[in-house]
């Protein structure tokens, strides 16, 4: 986090550190202490014509931003929603907090299973993990092969429903584990434009005599442009020679050797984890990979101003395909840091002016900008800001007092 990095790099002497603690808002030097609220979700029933059945769906929505009531959010769709929905929702909720700020707030759509083998396998096959046919009367593989039909359900029915009923951005992530992993890979290979980023945790490439490895070899050509992100991983699923591990190395080799334009990829191996514990680490690492450029990079702190911050968020907007707005609280904290540490009042004012432009309904933004103008000695501009803050929120007694003080001797 950029604020912690500020402290580690720039506050070597205790006396300076103590001075900074006195002058700086708490959230710049430590985590905030928000009231605990358990994850809650909308639970909907979607009648699918594609699947000819009703499907239960879990949907987590970030808290309403009162300053940006029309704010829209990226969406993460996760398979095995009955197992992984709450885990991912908690990760996203924490990592998007204002005092963490390494990813955006995001809508989570969990897709619980109804017939997992049917929906999460791309072909019909009765060949098991050991390469032997399961011809028993109760073979769990008999219903397999509905994966492409399931992707049609997601693309033609689920995504349109979510887009119609929730405030979504175009950036979408598709995440899955094991059979869910080959489902996300199959989507990337056959319908890459359905999602912007893909997560495949221990994908079951063994399925149907490594069908998807052959498909990857066919589809991932170096003359293709695939402007997507993909994170894939495996764990200790039978030592280093396990089918999961060797097959994922084959897939990774295809991705690396083809050097596909625009395909941003990362492979992670978790030898100390099992097939079922791996998602706890892998989903976190996948989110950090996809949004690794989200926070402001460390730079020459004296040069931080509105131009630098705007440029960073313009780059994020281009990367993720929607307009990304700098968080009001974080911009204010950077401005206060610049004043306390460098006396860089003009740079701080440029940041606070940007806040009033991005958050025109925020009385706090105008009040804080008024404080900065007053500190500079520009009473007339301070008065304008205080009046604007009071117009937005008339009951602010502290702002009324500031306005009275700034108006004297004008």
Language model features by range: what are they?
Residues 245, 249-252, 258-324:
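C-terminal catalytic histidine-bearing segment of alpha/beta-hydrolase fold enzymes
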Residues 30-74:
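A domain-start/cap signature at the N-terminus of enzymes
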Residues 336-337, 371-374, 405:
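Residue-level recognition of tetratricopeptide repeat
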Residues 206-269, 273:
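The feature captures the conserved acid-bearing segment of alpha/beta-hydrolase catalytic domains
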Residues 83-151:
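Active-site machinery of serine-nucleophile hydrolases
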Residues 324, 328, 345, 363-364, ...:
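Helix-start (N-cap) detector for alpha-helical repeat units in TPR-like alpha-solenoids
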């Amino acid at each position: 986090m950029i604020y912690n990095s500020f402290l580690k790099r720039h506050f070597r002497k205790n006396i300076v550190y103590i001075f900074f603690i006195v002058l700086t808002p708490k959230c710049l030097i430590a985590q905030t202490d928000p009231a605990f609220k358990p994850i809650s979700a909308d639970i909907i029933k979607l009648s699918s014509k594609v699947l000819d059945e009703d499907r239960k769906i879990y949907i987590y929505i970030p808290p309403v931003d009162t300053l940006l009531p029309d704010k829209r959010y990226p969406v993460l769709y996760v398979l095995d929603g009955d197992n992984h929905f709450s885990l991912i929702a908690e990760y996203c909720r924490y990592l998007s907090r204002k005092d963490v700020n390494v990813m955006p707030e995001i809508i989570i759509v969990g897709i619980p299973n109804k017939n997992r083998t049917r929906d999460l396998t791309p072909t019909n096959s009765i060949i098991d993990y050991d390469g032997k046919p399961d011809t028993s009367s109760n073979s769990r593989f008999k219903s397999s092969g509905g994966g492409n039909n399931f992707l049609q359900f997601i693309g033609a029915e689920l995504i349109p429903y979510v887009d119609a009923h929730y405030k979504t951005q175009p950036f979408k992530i598709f995440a899955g584990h094991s059979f869910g992993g080959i489902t996300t890979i199959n989507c990337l290979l056959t319908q890459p434009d359905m999602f912007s980023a893909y997560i495949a945790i221990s994908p079951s490439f063994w399925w149907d005599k490594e069908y998807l490895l052959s498909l990857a070899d066919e589809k991932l050509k170096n003359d293709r442009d695939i402007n997507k992100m993909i994170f894939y991983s495996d764990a200790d699923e039978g030592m280093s020679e396990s089918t999961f591990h060797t097959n994922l190395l084959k897939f990774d080799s295809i991705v690396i050797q083809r050097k596909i334009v625009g395909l941003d990829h990362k492979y992670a191996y978790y030898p100390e984890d099992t097939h079922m514990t791996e998602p706890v680490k892998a989903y976190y690492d996948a989110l950090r990979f996809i949004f690794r450029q989200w926070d402001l990079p460390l730079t020459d702190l004296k040069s931080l101003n509105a131009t630098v911050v705007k440029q960073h968020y313009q780059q994020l907007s281009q990367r993720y395909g929607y307009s990304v707005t700098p968080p009001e609280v974080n911009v204010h904290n950077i401005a206060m840091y610049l004043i306390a540490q460098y006396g860089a009042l003009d740079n701080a004012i440029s940041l606070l002016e940007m806040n009033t432009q991005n958050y025109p309904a925020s009385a706090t933004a105008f009040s804080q900008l008024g404080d900065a103008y007053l500190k500079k000695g520009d009473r007339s501009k301070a008065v304008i800001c205080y009046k604007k803050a009071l117009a937005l929120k008339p009951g602010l007694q502290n702002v009324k007092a500031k306005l009275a003080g700034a108006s004297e001797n004008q």
